[in-house]
A protein has these predicted regions:
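Hydrophobic alpha-helical membrane-insertion segments
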Residues: 21-27, 146-161, 253-258
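Hydrophobic membrane-targeting alpha-helices
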Residues: 26, 30, 34, 127, ...
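Alpha-helical transmembrane segments of integral membrane proteins
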Residues: 6-8, 103-136, 181-334
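An internal, D/E-rich "acidic patch" concept
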Residues: 3, 65-122
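Charged, compositionally biased N-terminal leader segments and the immediate start
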Residues: 2-34
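Short hydrophobic, aromatic-rich alpha-helical segments embedded in or entering the lipid bilayer
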Residues: 51-82, 271-282
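Membrane-water interface segments at transmembrane-helix boundaries in multipass membrane proteins
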Residues: 142-204
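Hydrophobic alpha-helical transmembrane segments of membrane transport/permease proteins
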Residues: 21-71, 167-187
């Protein structure tokens, strides 16, 4: 791919991303405004029910809720372009600051979980492919099937019951103990159970995918040729099969980033873990428009971005797709 075509390629990707985010923001804004509930309750609490009609009208004017929905959106979009995403009704501070205060916990839980899922699924998939049909393969298959069928909220409650209530060896809620915000060991202990749920809930699917892809590659004609040259099954798998499997695996893992982070939202709620998951639940419950809008926009933008990254990985790494692109470029040139 030549330099001008690369610029055009990434320019198209950037334009597609911006247009998708624009449409997403408009859709989320309209849906959040049309949802049932009273946002003044979030802002004023119990006092909202005691407001007179005149005071209610003044409050709606103050928050910009008296304007048409499209006018509200245009005003929100103009402010958002300058980095102003509005004030959280519940926390009485900028929505971006509220999210920033919680994002670290979610990124820690989701980031460590994603790295463990990526590493362990790759290792498990390779081991199961090498030992196809053995007791190890069957045991992993059965364990994965059972674990994958358990809902994350139920698995969370089960681990809390066993390790936090019965055995009392691990904390079952929060991100740290009172007064232990800077204690790394205490934070790590609070991370173990939620992290276990996140990893167990996603690990097996990707391990199965790696195993099946490797087994498909092992049946290809080039593997017979490699074995005829004296290469062992292990060498063929590592040098050839794994290399051909990685583009698909990397693109699927890129798409899965939002899915893994979305899984942490449920886990955070069950474990009362102070991250974006509990924040999203609170913003929806209290109809905190600005906070809910920014959370939804960030989540949607992450999904769109990861989809584009996955597509780019496939197009840039997979030699078959690169060859097709080269043929198309050659046909376009005079």
């Amino acid at each position: 791919m030549k330099k001008p075509s690369k610029i055009l390629y990434f320019g198209k990707k950037a334009l597609a991303f911006l247009l998708s985010v624009l449409v997403l923001s408009l859709a989320v804004f309209y849906v959040s405004r049309l949802a049932p509930g009273d946002p003044l309750v979030s802002y004023y609490g119990d006092r909202a029910e005691k407001l007179t009609p005149q005071e209610r009208a003044q409050a709606e004017e103050k928050l910009g809720l008296d304007e048409p929905i499209f006018t509200q959106y245009v005003r929100w979009a103009q402010n958002a372009l300058h980095g102003d995403f509005g004030i959280s009704y519940k926390y009485k501070m900028p929505a971006a600051e509220v999210i920033a205060s919680r994002a670290g916990n979610t990124l820690l839980l989701g980031g460590v979980g994603f790295v463990l899922i990526f590493t362990l699924s790759l290792l498990l998939g390779m081991l199961c492919a090498r030992r196809e049909g053995t007791l190890f393969d069957r045991a992993v298959c059965k364990l994965g099937t059972i674990t994958s069928c358990i809902p994350e909220f139920w698995l969370s409650l089960l681990l809390i019951l066993i390790f936090a209530i019965e055995l009392r060896v691990l904390p079952g809620s929060g991100a740290y103990s009172i007064g232990q915000q800077n204690n790394i060991a205490d934070r790590a202990a609070h991370l173990i159970l939620p992290l276990a749920v996140v990893v167990l809930g996603h690990l097996w699917y990707y391990a199965y995918m790696i195993q099946n892809r490797l087994l498909d590659e092992m049946r290809a004609d080039y593997v017979l040729l490699a074995k005829a040259k004296g290469l062992t099954r292990r060498a063929v798998m590592l040098r050839h099969c794994l290399r051909n499997t990685m583009p698909t695996y990397l693109s699927i893992m890129a798409i899965s980033v939002p899915h893994v982070l979305g899984g942490t939202y449920i886990v955070e709620t069950v474990f009362s873990y102070p991250g974006l998951g509990t924040l999203a639940y609170e913003s929806a419950r209290y109809k905190d428009y600005n906070l809910l809008m920014l959370l939804s926009l960030l989540s949607g933008a992450l999904v769109i971005l990861c989809s584009i990254i996955a597509q780019t990985i496939n197009e840039q790494i997979d030699p078959r797709i690169r060859a097709e692109q080269a043929v198309r470029e050659a046909e376009v040139q005079p």
